[in-house]
From Swiss-Prot:
This is Protein kibra. Regulator of the Hippo/SWH (Sav/Wts/Hpo) signaling pathway, a signaling pathway that plays a pivotal role in organ size control and tumor suppression by restricting proliferation and promoting apoptosis. The core of this pathway is composed of a kinase cascade wherein Hippo (Hpo), in complex with its regulatory protein Salvador (Sav), phosphorylates and activates Warts (Wts) in complex with its regulatory protein Mats, which in turn phosphorylates and inactivates the Yorkie (Yki) oncoprotein. Kibra acts synergistically along with Ex and Mer to regulate the Hippo signaling pathway. It holds the Pfam family WW. Residues 1-47, 521-554, 847-882, 898-921, 950-980 are annotated as: Disordered. Residues 906-920 have a biased composition (Acidic residues). One of its GO terms (cellular component) is apical plasma membrane. Forms a complex with Mer and Ex. Interacts (via domain WW 1) with Ex (via RXPPXY motif). Interacts with Mer, Sav, Hpo and Wts. The lineage of its organism: Eukaryota, Metazoa, Ecdysozoa, Arthropoda, Hexapoda. GO terms for biological process: cell migration; negative regulation of organ growth; positive regulation of hippo signaling; regulation of DNA-templated transcription. It comes from Drosophila virilis (Fruit fly).
Length: 1276
């Protein structure tokens, strides 16, 4: 083709496809994406065309020949595909353009058809949505039919109950019993007859109330289905089924107005509910007499608890010294990090689990099971009808009805077991994950409180809203998100319907009448396993709790009766039902095998936050870290320790140190300390090694305690001992040993055992009774001393001190206690210390005596403990092998250097951030721990020793006076901190410098930041001063999930539905408040009894009860945030550009999901003159028999009709679709009219449920007032 012919063809193209003339193109405010002129620079413009720009830089083209302007480049016809079939990748055909609006998002312009639309024309998502909507409406129609059938069956039950009541009423009036269906006793006893009459009356009232609930459910479902039908019809009526941008903007503005009304209406609802709480409390006070009223007012939820008289209100770590406090803080932070990881994992599992359960399917399954239960109850009612006085025709009708019901129940059970068995299993797994998530949030909140208590003396702070990995989901968008519209805050955290329990109960009811085929194996196993109490669950069938270790003692009298049953329960395998929710198993991180597990009871944590010594725990953590860091051989912890505590505080215990049994009863527990023979971390089975319990370097005493309340006597049993030779080496063969015990302080008497010559395994078996009141006992400490006797000379060689503050008088205990050697206690007369003494005091004394006694010997056979004398422990955990003072500085000096060396090697690897954090957490724990065992074992692996650098200003080391003990080591090299320079040369004496840290140094995030030291760096400052991250600006080309006009219309109708039901709830709450207030003023006992006993009303007021603990309210907020986080996680799994099927299913199921219900008072309370039961006239005795026949025939007819309905659901669905628009005027909410949307909801004005609209015939097109330009977009 020649150039002249090509130019002629280019000149003819605009004439063949004339572009429409744009009007007021300078009013276009949207940012368009189009081919720039530079992209067609190799092709010249056709003759007669020109390029121009408007005031905002938008390029347009002028056709001088036809005197028109257009946005389309005339050269696009040669460079762009001609149709969607020719497009490759993200291309658009000629005539289409993609644009972006800051409020709406992406939209598309069709210049050829002169229209705009929200949908991407390249995707078929709209047709998929329409098919999903049609499928859901069909399923919802089935669900509605189940509800209607349930209504029919319950109506027949009501007729039978009404008939029985009228029959008993006649008997009570006539005192005759010819045709009575009651027992022979009540036929002649007027009192029993009146009791039967009252029961029948109550049964009729209950059935009427249930009928009212079913009616409300049916109306709610019908209204939601009609809304969905109308949405579908409205979208199909549009051209191409799409809204243009003008309508999209108007709908968005309307949604924002509705949201404002919802916010104000929710405030009104909360205020009404708080008023109902006050009225309910007042009615409760009126139900009791004046004496009890005073007691109730004292326990009023509105009273404030005074804590001025309490003495222990300090933080969790204030009673510890500086070193122990920082060690505890480091461990707590490590636990907090592990719980955060566990929460993230649970969120991911829940996000994965949502896709396995269809939205709305649980409600449908519940209706099926409830329908089966109603038919079972109807069958029972029919079986209870007496046939003695019935005619042959009546008997035949009743028996046919029974047979029909039995056949229906058979079919229903078979369908239920095959259809919903897997769904119920998925639902149960989801509930288990939700329970674990709730408990994990509680645990995280507890740890945050502990960290905040530590920050009372330090600059560290933590906030759930500003910390890394926070659950905060605040969005910078002004538009409403999916969670804002479709997630009800009142429904989050609420206990959902236990459909599995309904299924089991219905099966048990039906099995009373007929044996069914075997149930699905999963459900059958769930039925056989019953929940156990938390104190009776064992996670291993071979749990060592079921055996005696060591054999039983005299202290086990009165405690043998329940042992076989308890052991049988302990051997049961755990299931979903009996798994302990309070101790969720946290998966161990790759490099750290000791994840935390803490108790969730607030009282337990606050009362005894340090029930166990942390020294051995730090040793175990050090051993794991040393193995990872390759610093040396594992620490020699000498096997497992003895079972010394049966109810430990699990807050400080890593997972691998916990017993595999969760028993909290006072059976003998077995230590789960790490040893070479422990397989608890691998197989879940832990067997105690008896051969390793008595070690040469471990001295122990077995002590039993029991309190007899009636006699007021404490029974102390000194049973036996192990390895007392480790405390003292006998010089002669006639040495003996005995035990002496006394209650301190102010003990006037003491008790002692017989003297024995066996120091290895002496068996005393002496029991003593000490008269003492319980109040005084809890303030005492039991001190047991080990005394050696050689001839006439006696010497105290060890002691055990037990705080009675934690003794449980309800249980008997038998425990092994470590014995503290006398070498570490300067004077045993001074053991009568206050019960709040800390572990560090004993540690300092132990270190001092260790240096004096062991400076020239290698004897390490002392069996002692640093922190025996503490109030928060019932026993000791560790053996004290205290090192010299300078060794503590050596480990604080050497280990950080090694860690810094590792950090330099791993600084470029992003995957090692968590590992570096664990290493620094370890450094903070090690440098501040007084564990002699740890230091001695580490000393054996050290190759070079350094002097004390003295850069820590806290009390991490023993007092200053003890430094003279180590002057002989001054020739060692001095290693100073790199953050200062000495002002004088280092002399032969040790150079000690104490550094006062600056603000940026002391306020750093303790042991978490993996960065190298930079003074004043942002990472070293407290998180409370960290500036907030700037909000990210929405980019033009972002990965988005496609939205359609159907999505937009569903969002709008969902907002209107929420507003409608909120108005209805406010109206009902106002009416309920008025009635209850009048009853409160008039002191009506009936209404007061209803308010106290009605479960639905109690659940309602519990939502807004100010007596609810702040922790529960905060938990609700965390659950709401977590729900949003789960939704975001699920959205991230959707492929790029793919539609979110699950979210759309949740949208359409929202309209048939019932929200919060407000209870209604019985009609007899509202209208006292009206009788709730319609009594029959007694003019003819034959009417009763006719009614029975009519009832049975009606039941049979209803059952046949229901089966026919199930066969013709498709026809009914089409009929419902055709009649949906005709029903719309009577069923849709007033929120369709935009008039009430813009105004806030007043307190006293509400929209009734069935209130007709005066202007409902107003056409919807008048809702939008726009001037639409087909080329440019829209002028609003």
């Amino acid at each position: 083709m020649s150039n002249q012919q090509q130019q002629q063809q280019q000149q003819q193209q605009p004439r063949q496809h004339p572009q429409p003339h744009p009007h007021h193109h300078h009013h276009h405010l949207h940012h368009h994406h189009q081919q720039q002129p530079g992209q067609h620079s190799e092709f010249p413009l056709p003759e007669g065309w020109d390029i121009a720009r408007d005031f905002d830089g938008k390029t347009y083209y002028i056709d001088h020949i036809n005197k028109k302007t257009t946005w389309l480049d005339p050269r696009d016809r040669y460079t762009k595909p001609q149709s969607f079939e020719d497009c490759v990748g993200d291309e658009l055909p000629v005539g289409w353009e993609e644009a972006y609006d800051s409020n709406i998002g992406r939209y598309y312009i069709n210049h050829i058809a002169q229209s705009t639309q929200l949908e991407d024309p390249r995707q078929e998502w709209k047709s998929v949505q329409e098919q999903m909507l049609s499928d859901y409406l069909s399923a919802a129609q089935d669900q509605l039919e189940n509800k209607r059938e349930m209504y029919d069956v319950k109506q027949q039950r009501l007729n039978l109950a009404q008939e029985e009541y009228n029959h008993l009423n006649k008997l009570a009036a006539s005192r005759s019993s010819l045709c009575s269906s009651s027992s022979s006793m009540s036929r002649h006893d007027p009192e029993l007859l009146r009791a039967d009459l009252m029961l029948a009356r109550e049964r009729v009232r209950q059935l009427k109330q249930e009928l009212t609930h079913i009616t409300n459910d049916i109306s709610y479902t019908e209204r939601g289905m009609n809304t969905l039908y109308s949405v579908g019809e409205k979208i199909n009526a549009r051209k191409n089924g799409c809204y243009d941008i003008a309508e999209v903007q108007a709908i968005r503005e309307e949604m924002l107005k509705v949201h404002k009304s919802l916010v104000s209406g929710e405030k009104v609802r909360e205020e009404l509910m708080r008023s109902l709480v006050q009225i309910k409390n007042e009615l409760s006070r009126q139900q009791i007499n004046e004496e009890n009223a005073e007691l109730m007012s004292a326990a009023s939820p509105f009273d404030r608890v005074c804590v001025a008289s309490q003495t222990d209100l300090c933080g969790a770590g204030e009673h510890l010294n500086g070193g122990a406090r920082f060690a505890e803080m480091a461990k707590t932070k490590l636990q907090y990090a592990e719980w955060r990881k566990h929460i993230k994992k649970l969120q991911q599992q829940l996000a994965d689990h949502v896709e396995r359960i269809e939205p709305g399917q649980l409600e449908s399954d519940k209706d099926r099971i409830l329908l089966i239960q109603e038919k079972e109850k109807l069958l029972n009612d029919l079986n209870s009808i007496s046939l003695k006085s019935r005619s042959a025709e009546e008997k035949q009708v009743i028996q046919q009805t029974r047979h029909k019901l039995e056949e229906d129940l058979k079919e229903a059970y078979e369908a239920t077991n095959t259809c919903i068995a897997n769904r119920l299993r998925f639902h149960e797994e989801k509930q288990l994950l939700l329970d674990k998530l709730q408990e994990a949030l509680k645990s995280t909140k507890l740890l945050e409180e502990r960290l905040k208590s530590f920050s009372s003396e330090s600059t560290f702070s933590i906030s759930s809203g500003s910390s890394l990995g926070s659950l905060s989901t605040a969005s910078s968008k002004s538009a409403l998100s999916f969670t804002d519209i479709y997630i009800d805050p009142f429904a989050v955290g609420e206990s959902p319907i236990d459909v599995v329990d309904l299924q089991r109960r219905s099966q048990r009811l039906f099995q009373q009448h007929q044996r069914l085929p075997p149930v699905h194996p999963a459900l059958q196993q769930q039925q056989q396993t019953q929940p156990l109490a938390s104190s009776e669950v064992s996670l291993s069938p071979r749990s060592s709790l079921s055996m005696e270790t060591p054999p039983a003692s005299p202290m086990k009298y009165n405690a043998v009766a329940d042992q076989p049953q308890a052991q049988a329960k302990l051997k049961e395998e755990p299931t979903y039902a009996n798994a302990l929710p309070a101790l969720p198993t946290i998966p161990a991180p790759p490099a750290y095998a000791a994840p935390p597990a803490i108790p969730l009871a607030l009282a337990a944590v606050r009362a005894h936050p340090y029930d166990l010594d942390s020294t051995v725990l730090d040793c175990m953590m050090l051993e794991a870290k040393l193995q990872k860091l390759n610093l040396g051989s594992p620490l020699n912890l000498n096997g497992p320790l003895s079972p010394i505590s049966e109810k430990p505080s699990l807050l400080d215990l890593p997972q691998e140190m916990l017993s595999r049994s969760s028993s909290t009863s006072n059976t003998r527990s077995v230590s789960a300390a790490v040893s070479n023979e422990s397989v608890a971390g691998d197989s879940g089975v832990f067997e105690a090694s008896r051969a390793h319990l008595p070690r040469k370097e471990l001295a122990q005493v077995q002590i039993g305690l029991k309190y007899l309340k009636q006699e007021g006597v404490l029974v102390v049993s000194l049973e036996r001992a192990n390895n007392l030779s480790a405390l003292w080496t006998a010089t002669t063969d006639n040495s003996q040993v005995y035990l002496r015990a006394a209650l301190l302080p102010n003990s006037l008497t003491s008790i002692r055992t017989k003297a024995l010559s066996d120091f290895q395994k002496p068996v005393f078996n002496d029991t003593f009774a000490v008269p003492i009141s319980l109040d005084k006992l809890l303030t005492k400490s039991l001190q047991v001393t080990v005394v050696s006797m050689t001839g006439q000379k006696e010497e105290i060689i060890g002691t055990v001190q037990i705080s009675m503050a934690e003794f449980n008088p309800e249980d008997s205990t038998l425990k092994w206690y470590n014995v503290l050697s006398s070498k570490f206690i300067p004077s045993f007369e001074s053991l009568d210390l206050p019960s709040t003494s800390a572990a560090a005091a004993a540690a300092a004394v132990a270190a001092s005596n260790s240096n004096n006694n062991n400076s020239n010997t290698n004897n390490r056979e002392e069996s002692s403990d640093e922190s025996t004398i503490t109030s928060s422990q019932t026993s000791t955990l560790t053996r004290n092998q205290a090192p010299p003072l300078e060794l503590q500085a050596q480990i604080a000096e050497e280990l950080p250097e090694h860690v810094r060396h590792n950090e330099q090697q791993c600084s470029d690897d992003d995957d090692d951030d968590d590992e570096e954090e664990d290493e620094q957490q370890l450094v903070g724990t090690l440098g501040l721990t007084h564990s002699g065992c740890m230091l001695d074992a580490y000393l054996e692996n050290m190759k070079q020793e350094y002097a004390d650098k003295e850069t820590n200003t806290d009390c991490a080391f023993p007092p200053e006076k003890l430094r003279s003990q180590s002057q002989l080591l001054d020739d060692r090299p001095v290693k100073r901190s790199q953050t200062f320079t000495p002002s004088a040369a280092v002399s032969k004496n040790r150079y000690n410098c104490r550094l006062n840290r600056s603000d940026s140094d002391s306020a750093m995030h303790f042991g978490v930041t993996p960065h190298t030291f930079h003074r004043g760096a942002v990472e070293r400052r407290s998180l409370r001063f960290q500036p907030k991250a700037t909000k990210s600006v929405t980019k033009l080309h972002h990965n988005h999930i496609p939205r359609t006009s159907l999505d937009l219309e569903l969002d709008l109708q969902a907002q209107h539905s929420k507003l409608f039901f909120l108005n209805d709830q406010i109206s009902k709450l106002q009416n309920l408040k008025e009635v209850l207030q009048k009853a409160c003023d008039n002191k009506d006992p009936l209404i007061a009894a209803w308010a106290i006993e009605n479960e639905e009303f109690q659940r309602l007021v519990a939502r807004a009860d100010p007596a609810k603990f702040p922790e529960e309210r905060l938990l609700q907020k965390l659950l709401m945030k977590t729900t949003k986080e789960i939704h975001k996680l699920r959205k991230t799994k959707v492929p790029k550009g793919a539609p979110d099927l699950v979210s759309f299913k949740e949208k359409i199921s929202f309209f048939t999901r019932k929200g919060m219900s407000v209870p209604e008072l019985p009609i007899e309370f509202m209208h006292p003159d009206a009788d709730a039961i319609e009594e029959e006239e007694e003019d003819d005795n034959d009417d009763e028999e006719d009614n029975v026949v009519e009832t049975a025939i009606a039941i049979n007819t209803a059952l046949v009709a229901s089966s026919n309905r199930n066969k013709n659901l498709s026809e009914h669905h089409h009929r419902s679709t055709d009649g949906a628009l005709s029903k719309l005027a009577a069923t849709l909410t007033p929120a369709i009219n935009p008039a009430p949307v813009s105004a806030p909801i007043p307190v006293a004005v509400s929209v009734p449920v069935a209130a007709p609209l005066a202007d409902e015939a107003k056409p919807e097109q008048q809702r939008y007032d726009y001037v639409v330009d087909r080329n440019y977009g829209v002028e609003v």
